[in-house]
Amino acid sequence: MSDSPTGPWKSMGHIMDRTWRTRGNHPGIIEYKGQSYVFGLNYDIMHLKTFRHHERRSVSAAPMYYNADGSIKKVPYWLDNVLEQVEPFNPFRKVEAETMAWGYGLKTIETGSDIYVSNIDEGEYLMLKGVDFRKGASRFEANVSNSRGRTAYIEVRLDAVDGPLCGTLKIDPAKGFKTVGCSLKDAKGVHDLYFVFKGEAGHDLFVWDWWRMK
């Protein structure tokens, strides 16, 4: 800590205490809409599958607060924090498919300036938290490429992977990317949004660029 950007500096200790769960020394601090956040690395997602050590770190975030003298209050370990959603998510616009709070099984690929969701297999899903459908969404559209020769589907569900089904988007085989849509029902208010993937091919069902609600 210092009164000058060029020092002299005084060490004030750790922002987050070292424990067996903490790994890496690559933090980042930002301020977003009046709230400070600290980012860092850990193995928590890898530990959902195995505790055998290998380098599969993921990024976590936590709210960060300052004392009156400008020093930083100690931040609890990532999983011990409550990270509140800043505001409801707006689905009534073009949303890149790789936007997610959680994804199961799928991967992303980068092609030039574009990023796509790929490696989509039967039963996998993508989830967004706190999506505000307002008074109701009546249509879901997605820009996809299905070159597998077998029909695929995106189920639009609320609040759980097996939650209420609002609509099912059918993706027929075709060359290149195309925009397809389906009608929705009972999609209103604020919910967690699940896109659940099904398909006759079983694996590598399609590649997904973007989506929007209407």
Segments (PLM) and residue ranges:
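Carbohydrate-active catalytic/glycan-binding domains of CAZyme proteins
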Residues: 1-214
